[in-house]
Amino acid sequence: MSERSSCEHGERANEVRSEVHGNSKVSMKSLLLLLSINLVYFVQVANAVGSGALTRDISAVVGGSHDSVWYSEVIAILTALLGIPASQAADLWGRKTILVCLTSCGFVGSLIIAKASSSGTVIAGFAVSGISFGAQPLLHAISSEVVARKYRPWAQGSINVSASLGAIIGLLIGGVLTRHEHHDGFRAYWYMVAGIYAVATVACQFFYNPPPRALESVLSVPEKMRNLDWVGYGFLTPALVLFCMSLAWSGNPYSWTDAHVLATFLIGVLSGVALIVYETSIKKNGMFHHRLFRDRNFALALGCIFAEGMAFHCGNNYFAFEVSVLFATDNLIIGAQYSMAFIALGISAIMSGIWCSISKALRFPIILAFGFKILFMVLMATVSNSFCNTSRIDRDYIRSYDLYRSLGGSIGLAVFNAIFSNGLSSNLGPKISHAVLPLGFPERELLQLIPALAHNDTVALKQIHGISPEIIHAGVDGLLEAYRVSFRGVWLTTASLCLVASIAGFFLRDPTEKFTSQIDAPIAPDTEVVEIKKRTKIPGDSA
Protein backbone atom coordinates (compact mmCIF):
# COMPACT_ATOMS: atom_id res chain seq x y z
CA MET A 1 0.00 0.00 0.00
CA SER A 2 1.38 3.44 -0.97
CA GLU A 3 2.03 6.13 1.61
CA ARG A 4 -0.74 8.30 0.21
CA SER A 5 -3.22 5.42 0.29
CA SER A 6 -2.17 4.63 3.84
CA CYS A 7 -2.82 8.23 4.80
CA GLU A 8 -6.27 8.13 3.24
CA HIS A 9 -7.09 4.87 5.07
CA GLY A 10 -5.86 6.44 8.29
CA GLU A 11 -8.05 9.50 7.83
CA ARG A 12 -11.08 7.32 7.09
CA ALA A 13 -10.31 5.34 10.23
CA ASN A 14 -10.26 8.57 12.21
CA GLU A 15 -13.66 9.43 10.79
CA VAL A 16 -15.03 6.04 11.84
CA ARG A 17 -13.65 6.47 15.36
CA SER A 18 -15.12 9.95 15.68
CA GLU A 19 -18.46 8.56 14.47
CA VAL A 20 -18.35 5.98 17.26
CA HIS A 21 -17.65 8.74 19.77
CA GLY A 22 -19.83 11.33 18.04
CA ASN A 23 -22.44 11.84 20.77
CA SER A 24 -20.23 14.18 22.81
CA LYS A 25 -21.01 17.86 23.09
CA VAL A 26 -18.90 20.58 21.50
CA SER A 27 -15.82 20.94 23.73
CA MET A 28 -14.55 24.17 25.28
CA LYS A 29 -11.44 23.94 23.08
CA SER A 30 -13.64 23.78 20.01
CA LEU A 31 -15.69 26.76 21.18
CA LEU A 32 -12.58 28.88 21.76
CA LEU A 33 -11.29 27.90 18.35
CA LEU A 34 -14.62 28.77 16.71
CA LEU A 35 -14.51 32.19 18.39
CA SER A 36 -11.00 32.73 17.00
CA ILE A 37 -12.10 31.68 13.51
CA ASN A 38 -15.10 34.00 13.75
CA LEU A 39 -12.81 36.88 14.74
CA VAL A 40 -10.68 36.28 11.63
CA TYR A 41 -13.80 36.32 9.46
CA PHE A 42 -15.05 39.42 11.27
CA VAL A 43 -11.93 41.42 10.44
CA GLN A 44 -11.73 40.11 6.87
CA VAL A 45 -15.24 41.35 6.14
CA ALA A 46 -14.50 44.68 7.85
CA ASN A 47 -11.46 45.02 5.58
CA ALA A 48 -13.39 44.08 2.43
CA VAL A 49 -16.35 46.33 3.24
CA GLY A 50 -14.03 49.24 3.94
CA SER A 51 -12.31 48.76 0.59
CA GLY A 52 -15.63 49.42 -1.12
CA ALA A 53 -17.44 51.83 1.19
CA LEU A 54 -14.45 54.11 1.85
CA THR A 55 -13.07 54.14 -1.69
CA ARG A 56 -13.99 57.76 -2.37
CA ASP A 57 -12.53 58.90 0.96
CA ILE A 58 -9.22 57.21 0.20
CA SER A 59 -9.13 58.72 -3.29
CA ALA A 60 -9.91 62.18 -1.90
CA VAL A 61 -6.77 61.98 0.27
CA VAL A 62 -4.22 60.09 -1.86
CA GLY A 63 -5.60 60.83 -5.35
CA GLY A 64 -5.73 58.34 -8.22
CA SER A 65 -9.51 57.97 -8.42
CA HIS A 66 -9.14 56.02 -11.68
CA ASP A 67 -7.22 53.34 -9.73
CA SER A 68 -9.83 52.99 -6.99
CA VAL A 69 -11.49 49.98 -8.65
CA TRP A 70 -8.40 47.98 -7.69
CA TYR A 71 -8.93 48.47 -3.95
CA SER A 72 -11.63 45.81 -3.87
CA GLU A 73 -10.51 44.04 -7.03
CA VAL A 74 -7.11 43.07 -5.66
CA ILE A 75 -8.73 41.48 -2.58
CA ALA A 76 -11.14 39.44 -4.71
CA ILE A 77 -8.37 38.33 -7.08
CA LEU A 78 -6.03 37.24 -4.29
CA THR A 79 -8.82 35.36 -2.53
CA ALA A 80 -9.44 33.39 -5.72
CA LEU A 81 -5.76 32.86 -6.52
CA LEU A 82 -4.61 31.83 -3.04
CA GLY A 83 -7.63 29.90 -1.78
CA ILE A 84 -6.91 26.49 -3.31
CA PRO A 85 -3.07 26.61 -3.04
CA ALA A 86 -3.38 27.59 0.62
CA SER A 87 -5.89 24.81 1.26
CA GLN A 88 -3.77 22.17 -0.47
CA ALA A 89 -0.66 23.39 1.34
CA ALA A 90 -2.57 23.20 4.63
CA ASP A 91 -3.23 19.49 4.03
CA LEU A 92 0.50 18.96 3.51
CA TRP A 93 2.12 21.31 6.05
CA GLY A 94 -0.69 21.67 8.56
CA ARG A 95 -3.66 24.00 8.95
CA LYS A 96 -2.23 26.10 11.76
CA THR A 97 0.95 27.26 10.02
CA ILE A 98 -0.88 28.41 6.90
CA LEU A 99 -3.74 30.03 8.84
CA VAL A 100 -1.52 32.02 11.20
CA CYS A 101 0.95 33.15 8.52
CA LEU A 102 -1.73 34.32 6.09
CA THR A 103 -3.78 36.08 8.77
CA SER A 104 -0.71 37.98 9.97
CA CYS A 105 -0.41 39.48 6.47
CA GLY A 106 -3.69 41.27 7.11
CA PHE A 107 -2.05 43.13 10.00
CA VAL A 108 0.88 44.25 7.84
CA GLY A 109 -1.29 45.26 4.88
CA SER A 110 -3.68 47.27 7.04
CA LEU A 111 -0.78 49.29 8.44
CA ILE A 112 0.41 50.02 4.89
CA ILE A 113 -3.07 51.29 3.94
CA ALA A 114 -3.29 53.45 7.07
CA LYS A 115 0.05 55.13 6.31
CA ALA A 116 -0.36 55.38 2.51
CA SER A 117 0.25 58.66 0.69
CA SER A 118 -0.47 57.51 -2.89
CA SER A 119 -2.96 55.26 -4.65
CA GLY A 120 -0.15 52.86 -5.57
CA THR A 121 0.75 52.41 -1.91
CA VAL A 122 -2.91 51.84 -1.05
CA ILE A 123 -3.17 49.14 -3.72
CA ALA A 124 0.03 47.56 -2.36
CA GLY A 125 -1.50 47.60 1.12
CA PHE A 126 -4.66 45.91 -0.10
CA ALA A 127 -2.51 43.37 -1.94
CA VAL A 128 -0.65 42.46 1.25
CA SER A 129 -3.81 42.39 3.36
CA GLY A 130 -5.50 40.46 0.55
CA ILE A 131 -3.07 37.60 1.19
CA SER A 132 -4.94 37.01 4.46
CA PHE A 133 -8.05 36.18 2.43
CA GLY A 134 -6.24 33.12 1.09
CA ALA A 135 -7.06 31.54 4.46
CA GLN A 136 -10.80 31.99 3.91
CA PRO A 137 -11.41 28.39 2.77
CA LEU A 138 -9.56 27.19 5.87
CA LEU A 139 -11.93 29.16 8.09
CA HIS A 140 -14.92 27.31 6.67
CA ALA A 141 -13.09 23.97 6.68
CA ILE A 142 -11.83 24.22 10.26
CA SER A 143 -15.17 25.35 11.66
CA SER A 144 -16.81 22.35 9.97
CA GLU A 145 -14.15 19.79 10.87
CA VAL A 146 -13.90 20.37 14.62
CA VAL A 147 -17.60 19.84 15.39
CA ALA A 148 -19.97 16.98 14.66
CA ARG A 149 -21.55 17.13 11.23
CA LYS A 150 -24.99 17.63 12.73
CA TYR A 151 -23.67 20.88 14.26
CA ARG A 152 -22.16 22.18 11.02
CA PRO A 153 -25.10 24.47 10.19
CA TRP A 154 -24.55 26.18 13.54
CA ALA A 155 -20.80 26.50 12.96
CA GLN A 156 -21.26 27.90 9.46
CA GLY A 157 -24.08 30.10 10.69
CA SER A 158 -21.80 31.58 13.35
CA ILE A 159 -19.34 32.56 10.62
CA ASN A 160 -22.09 34.38 8.73
CA VAL A 161 -23.15 36.15 11.92
CA SER A 162 -19.53 37.25 12.43
CA ALA A 163 -19.41 38.42 8.82
CA SER A 164 -22.55 40.49 9.33
CA LEU A 165 -21.20 41.99 12.56
CA GLY A 166 -17.89 42.82 10.85
CA ALA A 167 -19.74 44.56 8.04
CA ILE A 168 -22.13 46.45 10.33
CA ILE A 169 -19.43 47.67 12.70
CA GLY A 170 -17.11 48.45 9.80
CA LEU A 171 -19.74 50.48 7.97
CA LEU A 172 -20.82 52.43 11.03
CA ILE A 173 -17.33 53.12 12.38
CA GLY A 174 -16.09 53.95 8.88
CA GLY A 175 -19.02 56.33 8.47
CA VAL A 176 -18.34 58.04 11.80
CA LEU A 177 -14.62 58.44 11.07
CA THR A 178 -15.13 59.93 7.59
CA ARG A 179 -18.39 61.89 7.89
CA HIS A 180 -18.56 65.66 7.32
CA GLU A 181 -15.85 65.41 4.61
CA HIS A 182 -13.26 64.12 7.12
CA HIS A 183 -11.77 61.86 4.44
CA ASP A 184 -8.52 61.29 6.35
CA GLY A 185 -10.49 59.23 8.86
CA PHE A 186 -9.89 56.15 6.72
CA ARG A 187 -6.43 55.95 8.32
CA ALA A 188 -7.90 55.45 11.80
CA TYR A 189 -10.23 52.83 10.35
CA TRP A 190 -7.38 50.69 9.04
CA TYR A 191 -5.39 51.13 12.23
CA MET A 192 -8.41 49.57 13.94
CA VAL A 193 -8.49 46.77 11.35
CA ALA A 194 -4.77 46.13 11.90
CA GLY A 195 -5.34 45.79 15.65
CA ILE A 196 -8.14 43.27 15.17
CA TYR A 197 -5.99 41.29 12.73
CA ALA A 198 -3.24 41.15 15.37
CA VAL A 199 -5.62 39.85 18.05
CA ALA A 200 -7.09 37.29 15.63
CA THR A 201 -3.63 36.03 14.67
CA VAL A 202 -2.60 35.58 18.31
CA ALA A 203 -5.91 33.86 19.13
CA CYS A 204 -5.43 31.31 16.33
CA GLN A 205 -1.85 30.71 17.47
CA PHE A 206 -2.96 29.92 21.03
CA PHE A 207 -6.29 28.12 20.56
CA TYR A 208 -5.68 26.05 17.42
CA ASN A 209 -3.37 23.14 18.20
CA PRO A 210 -4.49 20.21 16.04
CA PRO A 211 -2.64 16.89 15.90
CA PRO A 212 -0.49 16.41 12.76
CA ARG A 213 -2.40 15.33 9.68
CA ALA A 214 -1.51 12.11 7.91
CA LEU A 215 0.10 13.66 4.83
CA GLU A 216 1.89 16.22 6.99
CA SER A 217 3.74 13.48 8.86
CA VAL A 218 4.40 10.97 6.10
CA LEU A 219 5.41 12.93 2.99
CA SER A 220 8.80 14.56 2.54
CA VAL A 221 9.14 18.18 1.42
CA PRO A 222 9.84 17.26 -2.26
CA GLU A 223 6.81 14.94 -2.22
CA LYS A 224 4.65 17.68 -0.76
CA MET A 225 5.80 20.10 -3.45
CA ARG A 226 4.91 17.57 -6.15
CA ASN A 227 1.41 17.22 -4.73
CA LEU A 228 0.63 20.87 -5.49
CA ASP A 229 -0.97 21.72 -8.84
CA TRP A 230 1.73 24.12 -10.06
CA VAL A 231 0.66 24.03 -13.72
CA GLY A 232 -2.93 24.79 -12.77
CA TYR A 233 -1.81 27.73 -10.63
CA GLY A 234 0.28 28.96 -13.56
CA PHE A 235 -2.75 29.01 -15.87
CA LEU A 236 -5.18 30.43 -13.29
CA THR A 237 -3.05 33.46 -12.38
CA PRO A 238 -2.77 35.12 -15.82
CA ALA A 239 -6.30 34.02 -16.74
CA LEU A 240 -7.84 35.82 -13.78
CA VAL A 241 -5.49 38.79 -13.43
CA LEU A 242 -5.28 39.74 -17.10
CA PHE A 243 -8.98 39.18 -17.74
CA CYS A 244 -9.88 41.46 -14.84
CA MET A 245 -7.29 44.05 -15.90
CA SER A 246 -8.74 44.21 -19.41
CA LEU A 247 -12.27 44.79 -18.14
CA ALA A 248 -11.10 47.32 -15.55
CA TRP A 249 -9.29 49.28 -18.27
CA SER A 250 -12.16 49.19 -20.78
CA GLY A 251 -13.57 52.69 -20.91
CA ASN A 252 -11.34 53.69 -17.98
CA PRO A 253 -9.19 55.01 -19.59
CA TYR A 254 -8.79 52.89 -22.75
CA SER A 255 -11.25 51.86 -25.46
CA TRP A 256 -11.91 48.22 -26.32
CA THR A 257 -9.81 48.50 -29.48
CA ASP A 258 -6.78 49.76 -27.55
CA ALA A 259 -3.87 47.30 -27.23
CA HIS A 260 -3.90 47.62 -23.42
CA VAL A 261 -7.41 46.16 -23.29
CA LEU A 262 -7.36 43.84 -26.29
CA ALA A 263 -4.01 42.16 -25.56
CA THR A 264 -4.69 41.53 -21.87
CA PHE A 265 -8.20 40.30 -22.64
CA LEU A 266 -7.05 37.80 -25.28
CA ILE A 267 -4.17 36.49 -23.17
CA GLY A 268 -6.48 36.14 -20.16
CA VAL A 269 -9.12 34.27 -22.15
CA LEU A 270 -6.55 31.95 -23.77
CA SER A 271 -5.04 31.21 -20.36
CA GLY A 272 -8.52 30.40 -19.07
CA VAL A 273 -9.14 28.02 -21.98
CA ALA A 274 -5.77 26.36 -21.33
CA LEU A 275 -6.71 25.95 -17.65
CA ILE A 276 -10.00 24.28 -18.57
CA VAL A 277 -8.31 21.89 -21.02
CA TYR A 278 -5.56 21.03 -18.54
CA GLU A 279 -7.85 20.42 -15.57
CA THR A 280 -10.43 18.40 -17.54
CA SER A 281 -8.21 16.31 -19.83
CA ILE A 282 -4.78 16.09 -18.21
CA LYS A 283 -4.89 16.70 -14.45
CA LYS A 284 -7.56 14.52 -12.88
CA ASN A 285 -6.73 15.28 -9.23
CA GLY A 286 -5.64 18.92 -9.35
CA MET A 287 -7.48 22.04 -8.24
CA PHE A 288 -10.72 20.65 -9.64
CA HIS A 289 -10.60 17.00 -8.55
CA HIS A 290 -12.81 15.02 -10.91
CA ARG A 291 -14.47 12.93 -8.20
CA LEU A 292 -15.98 16.12 -6.78
CA PHE A 293 -18.26 16.36 -9.81
CA ARG A 294 -19.80 12.90 -9.46
CA ASP A 295 -22.67 14.45 -7.50
CA ARG A 296 -24.72 17.09 -9.31
CA ASN A 297 -25.02 19.04 -6.06
CA PHE A 298 -21.39 20.09 -6.26
CA ALA A 299 -21.57 21.58 -9.76
CA LEU A 300 -24.87 23.32 -8.98
CA ALA A 301 -23.49 24.68 -5.71
CA LEU A 302 -20.44 26.08 -7.52
CA GLY A 303 -22.68 27.96 -9.91
CA CYS A 304 -24.76 29.32 -7.03
CA ILE A 305 -21.75 30.41 -4.99
CA PHE A 306 -20.22 32.06 -8.09
CA ALA A 307 -23.37 34.16 -8.49
CA GLU A 308 -23.43 34.90 -4.75
CA GLY A 309 -19.86 36.18 -4.91
CA MET A 310 -20.79 38.52 -7.76
CA ALA A 311 -23.87 39.72 -5.87
CA PHE A 312 -21.92 40.45 -2.68
CA HIS A 313 -19.20 42.45 -4.40
CA CYS A 314 -21.79 44.28 -6.50
CA GLY A 315 -23.58 45.50 -3.39
CA ASN A 316 -20.35 46.15 -1.52
CA ASN A 317 -18.97 48.41 -4.25
CA TYR A 318 -21.99 50.03 -5.86
CA PHE A 319 -24.58 50.53 -3.11
CA ALA A 320 -22.61 53.22 -1.27
CA PHE A 321 -21.46 54.67 -4.60
CA GLU A 322 -25.00 55.04 -5.94
CA VAL A 323 -26.45 56.39 -2.70
CA SER A 324 -23.65 58.96 -2.35
CA VAL A 325 -24.14 60.15 -5.95
CA LEU A 326 -27.93 60.22 -6.11
CA PHE A 327 -28.89 61.10 -2.56
CA ALA A 328 -25.86 63.08 -1.33
CA THR A 329 -26.03 61.86 2.29
CA ASP A 330 -23.05 61.59 4.62
CA ASN A 331 -21.02 58.42 5.09
CA LEU A 332 -22.58 57.48 8.41
CA ILE A 333 -26.08 57.52 6.94
CA ILE A 334 -24.91 55.50 3.93
CA GLY A 335 -23.21 52.98 6.22
CA ALA A 336 -26.32 52.70 8.40
CA GLN A 337 -28.48 52.11 5.32
CA TYR A 338 -26.21 49.40 3.92
CA SER A 339 -25.83 47.79 7.36
CA MET A 340 -29.53 46.85 7.17
CA ALA A 341 -28.54 44.16 4.68
CA PHE A 342 -26.02 42.71 7.12
CA ILE A 343 -28.45 42.84 10.03
CA ALA A 344 -30.75 40.74 7.86
CA LEU A 345 -27.78 38.46 7.10
CA GLY A 346 -27.11 37.85 10.78
CA ILE A 347 -30.76 37.08 11.54
CA SER A 348 -31.15 34.85 8.48
CA ALA A 349 -27.92 33.00 9.30
CA ILE A 350 -29.29 32.05 12.72
CA MET A 351 -32.67 31.06 11.28
CA SER A 352 -31.02 29.06 8.48
CA GLY A 353 -28.85 27.24 11.03
CA ILE A 354 -31.95 26.27 13.01
CA TRP A 355 -33.85 25.25 9.88
CA CYS A 356 -31.02 23.14 8.43
CA SER A 357 -30.32 21.40 11.75
CA ILE A 358 -33.96 20.48 12.27
CA SER A 359 -34.98 19.67 8.69
CA LYS A 360 -31.56 18.42 7.50
CA ALA A 361 -32.29 20.27 4.25
CA LEU A 362 -30.46 23.07 2.42
CA ARG A 363 -32.42 23.74 -0.75
CA PHE A 364 -35.19 25.97 0.64
CA PRO A 365 -32.94 28.59 2.34
CA ILE A 366 -30.72 28.74 -0.77
CA ILE A 367 -33.67 29.46 -3.07
CA LEU A 368 -35.13 31.96 -0.60
CA ALA A 369 -31.79 33.77 -0.25
CA PHE A 370 -31.42 34.25 -3.99
CA GLY A 371 -35.02 35.43 -4.17
CA PHE A 372 -34.21 38.24 -1.73
CA LYS A 373 -31.02 39.06 -3.66
CA ILE A 374 -33.03 39.43 -6.85
CA LEU A 375 -35.52 41.69 -5.05
CA PHE A 376 -32.69 43.87 -3.74
CA MET A 377 -31.08 44.20 -7.18
CA VAL A 378 -34.37 45.02 -8.88
CA LEU A 379 -35.23 47.67 -6.29
CA MET A 380 -31.81 49.28 -6.73
CA ALA A 381 -32.21 49.17 -10.52
CA THR A 382 -35.59 50.92 -10.40
CA VAL A 383 -34.48 53.96 -8.38
CA SER A 384 -35.93 56.92 -10.29
CA ASN A 385 -35.08 60.58 -10.57
CA SER A 386 -37.95 61.45 -8.23
CA PHE A 387 -35.96 59.87 -5.38
CA CYS A 388 -32.70 61.63 -6.19
CA ASN A 389 -31.28 64.64 -4.39
CA THR A 390 -29.44 67.10 -6.59
CA SER A 391 -27.38 68.45 -3.70
CA ARG A 392 -10.54 15.99 1.84
CA ILE A 393 -13.55 15.44 -0.24
CA ASP A 394 -15.40 17.65 2.19
CA ARG A 395 -12.30 19.81 2.42
CA ASP A 396 -12.10 19.85 -1.38
CA TYR A 397 -15.76 20.87 -1.50
CA ILE A 398 -15.17 23.80 0.84
CA ARG A 399 -12.02 25.07 -0.86
CA SER A 400 -13.73 24.88 -4.26
CA TYR A 401 -16.77 26.79 -3.00
CA ASP A 402 -14.55 29.60 -1.72
CA LEU A 403 -12.58 29.66 -4.97
CA TYR A 404 -15.74 30.03 -7.05
CA ARG A 405 -17.17 32.67 -4.71
CA SER A 406 -13.95 34.65 -5.07
CA LEU A 407 -13.88 34.06 -8.82
CA GLY A 408 -17.41 35.42 -8.96
CA GLY A 409 -16.32 38.45 -6.96
CA SER A 410 -13.16 39.22 -8.95
CA ILE A 411 -14.72 38.61 -12.36
CA GLY A 412 -17.90 40.35 -11.24
CA LEU A 413 -16.09 43.51 -10.17
CA ALA A 414 -14.29 43.67 -13.51
CA VAL A 415 -17.52 43.07 -15.43
CA PHE A 416 -19.44 45.62 -13.35
CA ASN A 417 -16.72 48.21 -13.84
CA ALA A 418 -16.83 47.67 -17.61
CA ILE A 419 -20.64 47.92 -17.66
CA PHE A 420 -20.69 51.03 -15.49
CA SER A 421 -17.81 52.82 -17.26
CA ASN A 422 -19.18 52.17 -20.73
CA GLY A 423 -22.71 53.05 -19.63
CA LEU A 424 -21.61 56.33 -18.09
CA SER A 425 -19.42 57.36 -21.02
CA SER A 426 -22.19 56.63 -23.53
CA ASN A 427 -24.98 58.33 -21.54
CA LEU A 428 -23.23 61.32 -20.01
CA GLY A 429 -23.21 63.54 -23.11
CA PRO A 430 -26.70 62.71 -24.42
CA LYS A 431 -28.40 63.04 -21.02
CA ILE A 432 -26.83 66.41 -20.19
CA SER A 433 -27.37 67.85 -23.67
CA HIS A 434 -30.99 66.65 -23.67
CA ALA A 435 -31.51 68.47 -20.37
CA VAL A 436 -29.86 71.84 -21.19
CA LEU A 437 -30.35 72.43 -24.92
CA PRO A 438 -34.14 73.00 -24.67
CA LEU A 439 -33.38 75.82 -22.21
CA GLY A 440 -31.42 77.75 -24.84
CA PHE A 441 -27.92 76.70 -23.82
CA PRO A 442 -25.51 77.06 -26.81
CA GLU A 443 -24.59 73.67 -28.25
CA ARG A 444 -20.97 74.72 -28.87
CA GLU A 445 -20.45 75.08 -25.10
CA LEU A 446 -21.38 71.46 -24.34
CA LEU A 447 -17.73 70.37 -24.60
CA GLN A 448 -16.95 72.61 -21.64
CA LEU A 449 -20.15 71.97 -19.67
CA ILE A 450 -20.10 68.16 -19.64
CA PRO A 451 -16.61 67.66 -18.09
CA ALA A 452 -17.19 70.55 -15.69
CA LEU A 453 -20.35 68.89 -14.36
CA ALA A 454 -18.80 65.42 -14.33
CA HIS A 455 -15.84 66.59 -12.23
CA ASN A 456 -17.86 69.05 -10.10
CA ASP A 457 -15.57 71.86 -11.27
CA THR A 458 -17.35 75.01 -10.07
CA VAL A 459 -14.56 77.29 -11.32
CA ALA A 460 -14.89 75.98 -14.88
CA LEU A 461 -18.68 76.24 -14.72
CA LYS A 462 -18.55 79.97 -13.97
CA GLN A 463 -16.39 80.59 -17.06
CA ILE A 464 -18.79 78.92 -19.53
CA HIS A 465 -20.67 81.30 -21.84
CA GLY A 466 -24.44 81.17 -21.38
CA ILE A 467 -24.34 79.46 -17.99
CA SER A 468 -27.06 80.15 -15.41
CA PRO A 469 -28.40 78.53 -12.22
CA GLU A 470 -31.25 77.07 -14.26
CA ILE A 471 -28.80 75.54 -16.76
CA ILE A 472 -26.64 74.13 -13.97
CA HIS A 473 -29.68 72.60 -12.25
CA ALA A 474 -30.84 70.99 -15.50
CA GLY A 475 -27.32 69.78 -16.27
CA VAL A 476 -27.04 68.16 -12.85
CA ASP A 477 -30.37 66.42 -13.45
CA GLY A 478 -28.96 65.04 -16.71
CA LEU A 479 -25.77 63.98 -14.95
CA LEU A 480 -27.72 62.10 -12.27
CA GLU A 481 -29.85 60.44 -14.94
CA ALA A 482 -26.68 59.22 -16.70
CA TYR A 483 -25.42 57.78 -13.41
CA ARG A 484 -28.78 56.17 -12.68
CA VAL A 485 -28.88 54.43 -16.06
CA SER A 486 -25.28 53.23 -15.62
CA PHE A 487 -26.01 51.84 -12.15
CA ARG A 488 -29.13 50.15 -13.50
CA GLY A 489 -27.05 48.09 -15.93
CA VAL A 490 -24.92 46.78 -13.05
CA TRP A 491 -27.90 45.84 -10.87
CA LEU A 492 -29.85 44.17 -13.67
CA THR A 493 -26.82 42.12 -14.71
CA THR A 494 -26.43 40.83 -11.17
CA ALA A 495 -30.17 40.19 -10.81
CA SER A 496 -30.11 38.07 -13.98
CA LEU A 497 -27.27 35.94 -12.63
CA CYS A 498 -29.06 35.52 -9.30
CA LEU A 499 -32.19 34.44 -11.16
CA VAL A 500 -30.23 31.70 -12.92
CA ALA A 501 -28.73 30.64 -9.58
CA SER A 502 -32.15 30.50 -7.92
CA ILE A 503 -33.44 28.26 -10.71
CA ALA A 504 -30.40 26.02 -10.26
CA GLY A 505 -31.24 25.84 -6.55
CA PHE A 506 -34.45 23.93 -7.35
CA PHE A 507 -32.32 21.07 -8.71
CA LEU A 508 -30.19 20.73 -5.57
CA ARG A 509 -30.61 17.53 -3.58
CA ASP A 510 -30.97 17.86 0.20
CA PRO A 511 -28.09 15.81 1.75
CA THR A 512 -30.09 14.62 4.77
CA GLU A 513 -27.83 11.59 5.24
CA LYS A 514 -24.81 13.84 5.88
CA PHE A 515 -26.14 15.33 9.14
CA THR A 516 -24.46 12.83 11.49
CA SER A 517 -22.42 12.88 14.72
CA GLN A 518 -19.16 12.36 12.83
CA ILE A 519 -16.29 14.76 13.61
CA ASP A 520 -13.88 14.84 10.68
CA ALA A 521 -10.87 16.44 12.40
CA PRO A 522 -10.95 16.62 16.22
CA ILE A 523 -8.52 19.27 17.47
CA ALA A 524 -7.11 16.95 20.15
CA PRO A 525 -6.99 13.16 20.70
CA ASP A 526 -9.67 11.87 23.05
CA THR A 527 -8.77 9.19 25.63
CA GLU A 528 -12.07 7.39 25.18
CA VAL A 529 -11.50 7.22 21.45
CA VAL A 530 -8.09 5.70 22.10
CA GLU A 531 -9.69 3.02 24.29
CA ILE A 532 -12.26 2.29 21.59
CA LYS A 533 -9.42 1.94 19.10
CA LYS A 534 -7.73 -0.64 21.31
CA ARG A 535 -10.89 -2.71 21.55
CA THR A 536 -11.98 -2.36 17.92
CA LYS A 537 -10.01 -3.46 14.86
CA ILE A 538 -10.50 -0.80 12.22
CA PRO A 539 -9.32 -1.34 8.60
CA GLY A 540 -6.33 0.85 7.81
CA ASP A 541 -4.89 1.07 11.36
CA SER A 542 -2.05 -1.24 10.45
CA ALA A 543 -1.35 0.41 7.11
Q: Regions from the language model: what does each represent?
A:
Residues M1-N47, S51, A60, T536-P539:
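Cytosolic juxtamembrane N-terminal segment immediately preceding the first transmembrane helix
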Residues M1-R12, G22, N209, L453-A543:
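Transmembrane-helix exit segments and adjacent C-terminal regions of multi-pass membrane proteins
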Residues S36-N38, A46-D57, G63, W70-I75, ...:
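Transmembrane core module of solute transporters
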Residues Y41, L82, W93-V100, G120-T121, ...:
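C-terminal module of multi-pass small-molecule transporters
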Residues V49, A76-I84, G134, A167-I168, ...:
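Residue-level signature of mid-helix packing/kink "hotspots" within the transmembrane helices
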Residues I58-S59, A89-A90, I112-I113, V122, ...:
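Interfacial helix-cap and linker-helix signal at transmembrane-aqueous boundaries
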Residues G83-V231:
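Helix-loop-helix hairpins in multi-pass membrane proteins, especially solute transporters
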Residues H182-G303:
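Hydrophobic transmembrane-helix bundles of small-molecule transporters
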